[in-house]
Amino acid sequence: MPPAAKTQVRTTSPSYEVQRMALANGLRIVVNPDASSPVVAVAVYYDVGMRSEPQGRTGFAHLFEHLMFQGSENLGKTEHFTYVQGNGGTLNGSTHVDYTNYYEVMPSAATELALFLEADRMRSVAVTQDNLDNQIAVVQNEIRVNVLNRPYGGFPWLKIPPLLFTDFANSHNGYGDFVDLESSTVQDARGFFDRYYAPGNAVLSVSGDVDAAQVFAWAEQHFGDIPAREVPTRPSFSEPLPTEQRRDVEHDALAPAPAVAVAWRVPDPADLTTYLPYVVLAEVLTDGDASRLQERMLLQDRSATSVGGYLGLLGDPLDARDPTPFLLEVHHSEQTPVDTVLTTIDEELARLASDGLTPGELDRTIARMTARYLREVDSVLGRATTMAVFEQQRDRAELLNELPGLLRAVTAQQVQAAAATLTPQTATVLELRPGKAS
């Protein structure tokens, strides 16, 4: 069958307004004014994540995220929550491989309040021994609930990095080791804040029913007097590509059935031209009943109970930096040998590499991806977080509008070429077996 020709996908690109400015202390600000509903999302992204943790302090980025909710210069321990929720808003934070973020979604009348709250903890966070001890216990309990006492806990995002990577920054447990967490000190936390939570290491992103000029004025008022600090140079975390297959077995006493994760390293996400074909490939293989692996393994062979594919350890391909993996995750019955699953994956990748896409397959895939993306950025929170990560990692919040066009530019030949690089010889395979290790 000849390769499918590139055809035009009839999808539109959004045209959200994006305005920007930078304060003298280095804080970058991006604003999307949208008067369609009286709400606002305020997000602050700090350029520090799990990869930046020092050796002996695994999980520290996540621990510090918790500390940022324990009070600040003008606010007591629970007052950040009280002010946001008392105004009908919601808030949260999360730690990722390459960044940590915090956000509020509020009625637009409370925009200045949200900015004040974020500025107050950027200026000074309440790092005390009591707060540190309390949050170490909270994080340890999270690990017990989400990893240690849950079937497939941490699989594969915590389990495969030590096999896929060799450097500590890329391979360590970003959720945290109990011994490392318990040995954390107030001095560690204060040093972490001083080093990574500087204004020049952050992006403030605002989307909603606001006037951009007013947001900039409030930002100057509340953030402008935070002293500038030296911003750490982000090191290169890249490491040599695997030259042979890496394989290991993980045992899970709580898992009811086996699973396997297969990972490959992909090109640097900074170059979207070479990276996006892999993002599209993951969708071709695993998104929906008509996708290659779902159709083959779930419907035809019935060799699996679920199949997933994504880029980045946490499943969002657009907030990943180099190095990052292409991951396939398959859950299957004990009656299906893991080598049967792996052979099927290899066969489907080889078929795609040799025969290419079928007519219309790329169009359908891009249309689904674009529709899903447009739904995500339809909300003010989706827009604020998308602008923030694009500005932080690519210096271009305007990719908010440009991404659908970049997806449309991906060709069938590029997807075919990407499939050809995912060979068994360079795969990292982590098999999960139910039960305790013998």
Task: Kindly label every feature range from the protein language model.
Residues 2-6, 166, 174, 199, ...:
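An aromatic/glycine/proline-enriched structural segment found at the starts
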Residues 2-11, 203-205, 331, 352, ...:
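C-terminal regions of mature proteins
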Residues 5-38:
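N- or domain-start disorder-to-order transition segments that initiate the globular core
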Residues 26, 34-84, 272-285, 294-297:
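Active/ligand-binding-proximal structured segments within catalytic/core domains
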Residues 26, 44, 62, 84, ...:
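Buried hydrophobic packing residues in well-ordered domains
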Residues 46, 72-73, 77-192, 347, ...:
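Acidic/histidine-enriched segments that form metal/cofactor-coordinating
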Residues 141-159, 238-257, 299-310, 355-401, ...:
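Short acidic/His-enriched helical or mixed secondary-structure segments at domain edges of catalytic enzymes
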